[in-house]
Amino acid sequence: MTRRYTRRETVKLMGAAAVGSSLLGAAPAAGASSVQPRARPDDRRSPSARAEEDLRGLFVILSTPYTASGALDYEDLAFQVEWLEHAGVHGLVWPQNSSDYPRLTDDEIRRGMETLARANRGRPMALVLGVQRDATREMVELARFAEALEPDMMIAMPPKVGSSLADYRTYYTSLAEVTSRPVMIQTQPNLPGVEFETDFILELASEYPHLGYVKEEAEPVFDRISALVGQPQIQRVYSAMRGRYFAYDLRLGVDGLVSGMSMYADVFAAMWAAYRAENWGDVRDIHAKLLVMLTCEEEIPGAGRYLLHRRGIFRTSRSRGGEVRLTQVQIDEIEHNLRGLEAYLLPVPSRRA
């Protein structure tokens, strides 16, 4: 099996001598799209994420790309798969909230699922298809469609139609009857006044063992993670929230991260490698630099889309959430903070003609 390098070995292989303008150069004007990061060592990660990590590790919720006219760009969606394999992640998740899910049509969702199933065929990453819908019947229909594509896992946020945990039970048990594949329960609270109780999750996982995968994001999130980790019914517990608390969540025992982070996938991969090497100093340092960028995204709407375009992952920065024109001051701030991550940035693969 290909050797797994520690974070320190990886950085050494990447030639961690030059820091600063040699990587990113001067801040570009609005609309610039290419970046010249460091070369990627061939042996950064083992060849089979599914076999080695066993549904552990980094599961990236793919962002949804759009053409200049606002149509879903299926070519860029497929290219994102190539980028994420190159970056060293373990799983692909789509479509969820970070994918612009509420703004996608049924036809776009189904065609996007088909696109990703084809693009990921023969690759080492696990494919996780999001099948949540507002009501149980619609969710079951989408889950049956997804099942035919043979993903490695499905994920579902709870329903928006209903009034009690009994409605949640009907929803998730119905999904469990559609597939025998692992199902990730995302604990986003969708029904006002309905608490997604951990005991309820344990009951579901006891009855349907393939429901024992949890993306935990309900408050109090740290207490809930602690209540789930190590329980015999629970197969995996995943961190969320853009990785904002990932370092602490790792200490609590989570099995990975599920979040929208395509623009930082290589950096989170470096953080995961440091964790696997038990190098908590590097975990802290990488996470601290990531937090600066995550804060920058909160301060500057549109920064995430800018970075997807800036790094060459997407061909446009188009969004369906309203167009944002960044000022040069905002671009300068994004670029300044991005330089803090340069030791971990990998080159985005060239697009095939």
Task: Describe each PLM feature range.
Residues 77, 109, 113, 139, ...:
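A general structural signal for well-ordered alpha-helical segments in protein cores
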Residues 20, 85, 248-353:
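Structured C-terminal cap/extension of enzyme domains
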Residues 61, 95, 157, 217, ...:
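Conserved residues at the C-terminal ends of beta-strands
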Residues 2-4, 9-32:
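N-terminal export signals
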Residues 52, 56, 65-66, 71-193:
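Active-site beta->alpha loop and helix N-cap motifs at the rims of alpha/beta catalytic domains
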Residues 119-125, 149-150, 179-181, 206-210, ...:
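Short helix-capping segments at alpha-helix termini
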